């Protein structure tokens, strides 16, 4: 019977995730994941982008209260902008909350001045991420007081769909953008593993508002997908599939793979065979210097093998405990499904 585990164990798995920040743009990062099976770059990139832009928790202002103002179609004495424009500006205030409960912030200003987000009194539980963001312009000798309620949530919640129950008279619900991720783009390029050059490389560009690091946002999105997909695994694995999981080895099972099963050039394969290197475990115990002393084995062959070893998170010069095992042929056959 065909082993079920071959459906996932035979696929190449990404072994490199690189994060690169942009010094000129705060809270923006480039994330590179490789290698991926052909087509998986688009599959994962699209899924990650959707989750990043819709499902992460963040903080936002959900309602405001201004003395003597009962609705958004009013005007505030001494304020250049009308209430609708002030609300629009308040929607652009970016927050980070350190507690799950809602908090009420205060804003007090005396003109003439430009009222900014940094003038909001937040307390210790809330942090303003864009303090220079303009809320309104206040005229000379005029005062402005405002109470702002902020909460934790996800996505974009319209004021008409707000979960604020029975707001007091004079308190105005506003649209709330909770998502800490501002933008996500991705592209897919080819990458090489050994002699195969058409594997996928996923490159993502993620920018947040500072409430969450891009690296953390990507990790949370991946965890959300993992939790959602877990339900679809509805089959029982065969005993031979479970065997690989229950047995413990003091080293990676990939070391039991024979080197003649690797996709090596003829020159590299012959060099390993002539040097009596049979298993990957035999190979990784050698240093790069040892390999370069092998007859007819040059730098090109070395780099070729290094790329293949990286696919399994292996390298030259490894210290492998208990190698070689006495029953190496039996172990190699038993663990064959875990690395094929």
Swiss-Prot record:
It catalyses: RNA(n) + a ribonucleoside 5'-triphosphate = RNA(n+1) + diphosphate. CDD domains: RNAP_alpha_NTD (cd06928). InterPro entries: DNA-dir_RNA_pol_insert, DNA-dir_RNA_pol_RpoA/D/Rpb3, DNA-dir_RpoA, RBP11-like, RNAP_asu_C, RNApol_insert_sf. Residues 251-340 are annotated as: Alpha C-terminal domain (alpha-CTD). The keyword Hydrolase does not apply. Its EC number is 2.7.7.6. Gene3D superfamilies: 5' to 3' exonuclease, C-terminal subdomain, DNA-directed RNA polymerase, insert domain, RNA polymerase, RBP11-like subunit. GO terms for biological process: DNA-templated transcription. Residues 1-236 are annotated as: Alpha N-terminal domain (alpha-NTD). The keyword Disulfide bond does not apply. It comes from the Bacteria. Keywords: DNA-directed RNA polymerase, Nucleotidyltransferase, Transcription, Transferase. It holds the Pfam family RNA_pol_L. It is an enzyme of class 2 (transferase). One of its GO terms (cellular component) is DNA-directed RNA polymerase complex. GO terms for molecular function: DNA binding; DNA-directed RNA polymerase activity; protein dimerization activity. Belongs to the RNA polymerase alpha chain family. DNA-dependent RNA polymerase catalyzes the transcription of DNA into RNA using the four ribonucleoside triphosphates as substrates. NCBIfam families: PRK05182.1-2, PRK05182.2-5, rpoA. Homodimer. The RNAP catalytic core consists of 2 alpha, 1 beta, 1 beta' and 1 omega subunit. When a sigma factor is associated with the core the holoenzyme is formed, which can initiate transcription. This is DNA-directed RNA polymerase subunit alpha. It comes from Rickettsia akari (strain Hartford).
